[in-house]
């Protein structure tokens, strides 16, 4: 299991959104990824501030609202 991959559900561990679940949308480089979640804004995040979970979402489209609904169904 690759820890940091597109579609992986993670928990943010730092910042104002700490403790919230998010999904990795894109890998920017070795230090940053783009994350979105129900209570997480669509923005880049340092991978050291993420704790990957065993859950993964299949990203069928780039629609943020669809991704948020799938994430809510996991919680």
Swiss-Prot record:
One Pfam family from the record: KOW
Domain of life: Archaea
Protein's UniProt name: Large ribosomal subunit protein eL14
A GO biological-process term: translation
Alphabetic keyword roster: Ribonucleoprotein, Ribosomal protein
Gene name of this polypeptide: rpl14e
GO molecular function: structural constituent of ribosome
A single Gene Ontology CC term: ribosome
NCBIfam families in the record: PRK04333.1 (NF003320)
Family indicated by similarity: Belongs to the eukaryotic ribosomal protein eL14 family.
């Amino acid at each position: 299991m690759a820890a940091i991959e597109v579609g992986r559900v993670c928990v943010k561990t730092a910042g104002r959104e700490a403790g919230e679940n998010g999904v990795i949308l894109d890998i920017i480089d070795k230090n940053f990824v783009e994350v979105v979640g129900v209570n997480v804004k669509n923005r880049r995040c340092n991978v050291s501030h993420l704790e990957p979970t065993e859950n993964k979402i299949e990203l069928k489209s780039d629609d943020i609202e669809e991704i948020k609904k799938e994430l809510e169904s996991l919680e």
